[in-house]
Amino acid sequence: MQQIIDLTVAFVQDRLKFAESGHDWWHIQRVWNNTKLILETEKADQLVCELTALLHDIADSKFHDGDETIGPRVAGEFLASIGVNQKIIEHVQQIILNMSFKASLGEIAFHSKELEIAQDADRLDAIGAIGIARAFNYGGYKNREMYDPNVKPKTNLSKEEYKNTTAPTINHFHEKLLLLKDKMNTPTAKAIAEQRHHYMEGFLQQFYAEWEGKQ
């Protein structure tokens, strides 16, 4: 198992060398660490969970013209090249295809404990202090406004609406980030998410106060 993990780490580090910094190797490492933390109290296939954590953003659809098949395909081709069992490969591919917040807005036919852990590990990195930093980093990357009081957040976005949004970054908090606490699957992730959610609420309160010149 360790050789497979080591080869995968090297592959991902090389592949994401020039990635946008919210979806780079450091994001992968944080999600990997979250995964291992959750696995301390959850029973699941450790190899599947760790490989998913390492490969889940190997070719994110956001940076490949919305193609949601390229990530699972690249991950599968790599894992096959290092001799990973086909059933494990297919499980990892299914998780990558179904683990995102965007995927959860549609119908998901696939389910496994490993998917739950992957979702939690990735979503934890989208909230709290790092989540705030990543949101504004991606907003800057896409040249979006930080905030526009005239553009109200939308609730209950469809999958297509979420994929195509160009709304200011602050809207992303209301349309996704503040919703993640209640979408966690495991007790470990739920406990961590409570604190990170509270931190984001405090940030938004301060942001709005400064925007309006009240503080």
Where are these regions (language model features)?
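An amphipathic alpha-helix signature
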Residues: 5, 9, 32, 72-76, ...
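Generic N-terminal amphipathic, Lys/Arg-enriched alpha-helix
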Residues: 7-18
